[in-house]
Regions:
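Short loop/turn motifs at secondary-structure junctions and domain boundaries
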Residues: 7-10
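Short acidic-glycine loop/turn motifs at beta-strand connectors
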Residues: 20-22, 94-95
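Compact, glycine-rich, soluble single-domain proteins
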Residues: 29-44
Length: 117
């Protein structure tokens, strides 16, 4: 999936595979835009594909990148992932290393529906 990334500006290719509770896998890649604010990250692309297909509960997301060491998702992606549960497992894989977290550890004070009045 990483190879499908559209990143003519940053050249930073990212792919993501999101596993739903039922074992289904949803894929995403980053898609950049000349208007940088319209760029979508691979993690969010995978979440949006899953939600569009009807999935709402997820086990884990695996992110593929060329970075060493591989980094965690950006803040925006952390917030979107946290929307679907604090126990979500996040794994970031680079060419020779990988790292794992729980989304609750990456975003301990996530904004959630319980804060909406």
């Amino acid at each position: 999936m990483q190879a499908r990334a559209y990143c003519p500006y940053s050249k930073y290719r990212v792919g993501a595979a999101l596993e739903a509770e039922d074992g289904s896998i949803y894929l995403g890649c980053n898609v950049e835009n000349a208007s940088y604010g319209l760029t979508i990250c691979a993690e969010r692309a995978a979440v949006f594909a899953a939600v569009s297909a009807g999935a709402r509960k997820f086990r884990r997301i695996v992110i593929a990148t060329d970075s060493e060491p591989p980094g965690p998702p950006c803040g925006g992606c952390r917030q979107v992932l946290a929307e679907f549960g604090s126990e979500l497992e996040v794994e970031s894989v680079g060419p020779s290393q990988s790292k794992r977290w729980r989304i609750r550890d990456l975003l301990p004070d996530a904004f959630g529906k319980e804060l909406l009045a």
